[in-house]
């Protein structure tokens, strides 16, 4: 997993002080197709972006976690592209924050690479995390969930 490879490459980007983004991210997994889906509901000043897709990594057993970390990386990269100086990642998977900050051990290559990629991206943008309970009625979190399912062909 490489931040530069998950959604294209971001070249140098000058952020605008005070410009903030908020992204609700989620992952899903389609057992039948063997695809991890990612969903990002991203708000930047004066814009809303809905991003979704799938990641296919044969032999990878991380299932929806692959979609979760991909969504977070794409959200951060997109905020950098939008010249934001700060992004809040709202997630329902505690690992999104805990692997990034090093609070949890990174026992598999996916979480190790995610930690490295997020920390590299943090050189260009201030990243904070906010946990929400999954399927708790939060409309925007539900939207990210639907996007992730759509990304891997579940809806």
Where are these regions (language model features)?
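RNase H-like nuclease fold core
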Residues: 4-66, 77-78
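RNase H catalytic domain
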Residues: 28-34, 73-143, 147, 152-154
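Loop-to-helix element that buttresses phosphate recognition and phosphoryl-transfer chemistry
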Residues: 67-71
């Amino acid at each position: 997993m490489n931040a530069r490879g998950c959604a294209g490459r971001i070249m140098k980007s000058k952020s605008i002080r005070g410009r903030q983004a908020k992204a609700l991210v989620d992952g899903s997994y389609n057992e039948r197709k063997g695809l991890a889906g990612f969903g990002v509901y991203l708000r930047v000043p004066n814009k809303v972006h809905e991003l979704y897709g799938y990641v296919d990594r044969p032999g990878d057993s991380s299932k929806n976690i692959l979609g979760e970390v991909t969504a977070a990386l794409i959200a951060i990269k997109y905020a950098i592209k939008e010249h934001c100086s700060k992004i809040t990642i709202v997630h329902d998977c505690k690992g999104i924050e805990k692997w990034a900050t090093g609070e949890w051990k990174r026992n598999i290559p996916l979480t190790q690479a995610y930690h490295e990629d997020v920390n590299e991206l943090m050189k260009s943008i201030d990243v904070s995390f906010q946990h929400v309970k999954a399927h708790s009625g939060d409309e925007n979190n539900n939207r990210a969930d639907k996007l992730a399912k759509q990304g891997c062909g579940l809806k």
